[in-house]
């Protein structure tokens, strides 16, 4: 599997706005199923962290006050990622924040997001649910640290993606795996996924 940048944001809410911003970002670079590089930073966007979010993530307003400005972090992380294809678990969420925070530094995303949640729904249908922690436990993958902190979640999503890639090769006979293929598989209706994968067998 080609080089992929797996991203996770911690935020103060669900939809980005002037009062709802990213508080932490982590990126792990996955290459041939292995994590080869990492970037992580808290980011100060000048917003207050609601109490329930602080309980969930352990990130407090006080921690953010001493963190680098969000714009500086996004410039760094944008340079770190470059044009590497992107992936996140529940990418619809992280994509919104990536685009919003990039927009604030006058940058535009050029690459697509693959989604390990959508892929797992299709490739791990017997899992009890498709939360990141559940899927990692179900697949017997290593515990990466505190859930709801960006680096632990990004590493979990990367390990899960490597597991899904192995499954595509071993169970479905796919030889050439690409980010484009992952992006196309996540759009196939779950009921038709096996039939769809048969057409790719041996390629």
Model-derived features: where do they sit?
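Acidic two-metal-ion nuclease catalytic site recognized across multiple nuclease folds
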Residues: 158-203
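Conserved non-catalytic scaffold segment of RNase H-like nuclease domains
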Residues: 1-111, 125-148
């Amino acid at each position: 599997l080609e080089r992929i940048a797996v991203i996770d944001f911690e935020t103060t809410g669900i939809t980005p706005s002037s009062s709802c911003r990213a508080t932490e970002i982590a990126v792990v670079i996955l290459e041939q199923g292995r994590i080869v590089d990492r970037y992580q930073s808290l980011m100060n966007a000048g917003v207050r962290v609601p109490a329930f979010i602080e309980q969930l993530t352990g990130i407090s307003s006080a921690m953010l006050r001493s963190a680098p400005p969000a714009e500086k972090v996004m410039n760094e992380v944008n340079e770190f990622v470059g044009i590497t294809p992107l992936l996140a678990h529940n990418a619809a969420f992280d994509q919104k924040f990536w685009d919003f925070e990039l927009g604030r530094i006058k940058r535009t995303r050029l690459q697509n997001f693959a989604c390990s949640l959508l892929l797992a729904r299709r490739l791990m249908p017997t899992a009890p649910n498709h939360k990141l922690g559940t899927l990692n436990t179900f697949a017997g993958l290593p515990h990466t640290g505190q859930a709801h902190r960006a680096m632990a979640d990004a590493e979990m999503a990367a390990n899960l993606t490597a597991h899904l890639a192995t499954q595509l090769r071993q169970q479905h006979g796919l030889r050439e795996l690409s980010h484009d293929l992952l992006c196309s598989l996540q759009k196939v209706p779950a009921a038709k996924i096996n039939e769809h994968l048969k057409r790719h067998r041996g390629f």
